Protein backbone atom coordinates (compact mmCIF):
# COMPACT_ATOMS: atom_id res chain seq x y z
CA UNK A 1 0.00 0.00 0.00
CA UNK A 2 1.17 3.51 -0.83
CA UNK A 3 2.36 5.68 2.05
CA UNK A 4 0.38 8.90 2.39
CA UNK A 5 1.09 12.49 3.40
CA UNK A 6 -1.37 13.84 5.95
CA UNK A 7 -2.31 17.40 6.88
CA UNK A 8 -3.94 18.22 10.21
CA UNK A 9 -5.68 21.58 10.42
CA UNK A 10 -5.89 22.40 14.12
CA UNK A 11 -2.87 20.36 15.11
CA UNK A 12 -2.29 22.25 18.35
CA UNK A 13 -5.53 21.18 20.03
CA UNK A 14 -6.31 18.01 21.93
CA UNK A 15 -7.90 16.24 18.96
CA UNK A 16 -5.05 17.21 16.65
CA UNK A 17 -2.48 15.99 19.15
CA UNK A 18 -4.18 12.64 19.64
CA UNK A 19 -4.49 12.24 15.88
CA UNK A 20 -0.75 12.92 15.51
CA UNK A 21 -0.02 10.33 18.18
CA UNK A 22 -2.03 7.71 16.28
CA UNK A 23 -0.65 8.62 12.86
CA UNK A 24 2.97 8.55 14.06
CA UNK A 25 2.50 4.82 14.69
CA UNK A 26 0.70 4.09 11.41
CA UNK A 27 2.82 2.14 8.93
CA UNK A 28 1.21 3.75 5.87
CA UNK A 29 1.77 7.39 6.86
CA UNK A 30 4.81 8.96 5.24
CA UNK A 31 4.67 12.56 6.51
CA UNK A 32 2.44 14.51 8.91
CA UNK A 33 1.89 18.26 8.58
CA UNK A 34 0.12 19.63 11.70
CA UNK A 35 -0.95 23.27 11.53
CA UNK A 36 -1.04 25.88 14.26
CA UNK A 37 -1.07 29.64 14.70
CA UNK A 38 0.79 29.23 17.99
CA UNK A 39 4.37 30.37 18.46
CA UNK A 40 5.12 27.28 20.56
CA UNK A 41 6.87 24.23 19.15
CA UNK A 42 5.02 20.99 18.53
CA UNK A 43 6.81 19.20 21.35
CA UNK A 44 6.11 21.99 23.82
CA UNK A 45 2.42 21.96 22.88
CA UNK A 46 2.12 18.16 23.01
CA UNK A 47 4.37 17.15 25.89
CA UNK A 48 3.67 13.44 25.44
CA UNK A 49 4.99 13.47 21.87
CA UNK A 50 8.63 14.38 22.37
CA UNK A 51 11.05 13.09 19.73
CA UNK A 52 8.28 13.10 17.13
CA UNK A 53 10.24 15.33 14.72
CA UNK A 54 6.99 17.13 13.88
CA UNK A 55 6.83 20.88 13.36
CA UNK A 56 3.83 23.13 13.07
CA UNK A 57 3.20 24.92 9.80
CA UNK A 58 0.57 27.53 9.04
CA UNK A 59 -2.60 26.63 7.17
CA UNK A 60 -1.56 28.65 4.12
CA UNK A 61 1.59 26.52 3.79
CA UNK A 62 -0.48 23.35 4.02
CA UNK A 63 -2.87 24.62 1.35
CA UNK A 64 0.04 25.34 -0.99
CA UNK A 65 1.71 21.93 -0.54
CA UNK A 66 1.57 19.76 -3.66
CA UNK A 67 1.63 16.23 -2.28
CA UNK A 68 -1.02 16.00 0.43
CA UNK A 69 -3.24 12.93 0.20
CA UNK A 70 -5.65 13.54 3.08
CA UNK A 71 -6.46 16.41 5.45
CA UNK A 72 -8.06 16.04 8.86
CA UNK A 73 -10.00 19.05 10.13
CA UNK A 74 -9.73 19.40 13.92
CA UNK A 75 -11.22 22.88 14.11
CA UNK A 76 -14.43 24.66 15.02
CA UNK A 77 -17.34 23.75 12.78
CA UNK A 78 -17.38 27.16 11.07
CA UNK A 79 -13.69 26.86 10.19
CA UNK A 80 -14.06 23.27 8.99
CA UNK A 81 -16.70 24.29 6.48
CA UNK A 82 -14.35 26.90 5.03
CA UNK A 83 -11.28 24.65 4.92
CA UNK A 84 -13.15 21.63 3.56
CA UNK A 85 -14.15 23.61 0.48
CA UNK A 86 -10.55 24.69 -0.15
CA UNK A 87 -9.06 21.20 0.11
CA UNK A 88 -11.87 19.48 -1.79
CA UNK A 89 -11.34 21.87 -4.72
CA UNK A 90 -7.73 20.62 -4.77
CA UNK A 91 -9.03 17.01 -4.96
CA UNK A 92 -7.67 16.19 -1.49
CA UNK A 93 -9.60 13.76 0.71
CA UNK A 94 -11.02 15.59 3.74
CA UNK A 95 -11.97 14.00 7.05
CA UNK A 96 -13.83 16.40 9.34
CA UNK A 97 -13.58 15.73 13.07
CA UNK A 98 -15.46 18.90 14.06
CA UNK A 99 -18.97 17.63 13.50
CA UNK A 100 -19.72 20.27 10.84
CA UNK A 101 -20.68 17.66 8.23
Describe the function of each predicted region.
Residues 1-101:
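N-terminal Rossmann-like NAD(P) cofactor-binding subdomain of oxidoreductases
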